[in-house]
Amino acid sequence: MSNISFDLAITSPLKRAKETAEILLEGRKIPLLEDERLAEMGFGCLEGYYCKGEKMNIPDPKFHYFYDDPACYQAPDGGESFKELLKRAKGFLADLCEKKAYENKTILLSTHGAMLRALLDTVKGIGVEQFWDSGVQKNCAVSVIEIKDGIAKVIEEGVIYYDDEVEDW
């Protein structure tokens, strides 16, 4: 991605996304802004548990709705629902589409799995019922959204620029 001329970068304030953006921008004089709306979906009292695969250790038997039926998923105490996540994504995208300062700019966004899915699904008009239908992208997968005349369109989704032997989360 070193051949892409970014005008600006916006990152989640969470460490993993911020460090990824800093690595991609290393040696470039590109502003890096933090935006809380790009943070990962909040899991409240379930933060820190593994939520997928053999390591899954979430004690709530209803958590399977998170992947199997997002419309029925109920956020844990202090957590965030899919509707809340999608609302955050929609607000962020509205700002990208409407702010003149972002017009005709190439902007790097560094975020997290569920938020990225929310951004892409919002652009494609997909609701909570089909939230995961396009799958979970691999870590550091690249998606491209183009905004023209205030309308967002997904151009590429889930492109990998590294050896694909990295373990899925």
Protein language model features and the residues they cover:
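Glycine-rich phosphate-binding loop signature in dinucleotide/nucleotide-binding domains
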Residues: 2-5, 96-105
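Acidic, low-complexity terminal tails and accessory targeting/binding regions
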Residues: 41-55, 102-105, 121-169
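Active-site catalytic microenvironments for nucleophilic, acid-base chemistry
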Residues: 23, 27, 95, 99, ...
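Short glycine/proline- and acidic residue-enriched helix-loop micro-motifs
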Residues: 62-84
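Short beta-strand scaffold positions
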Residues: 11-12, 87, 110-111
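GST superfamily/GST-like fold recognition
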Residues: 113-117
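Amphipathic, non-transmembrane alpha-helical scaffold segments
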Residues: 14, 82-90
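Phosphate-coordination/substrate-recognition cap region in phosphate-metabolizing enzymes
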Residues: 1-64
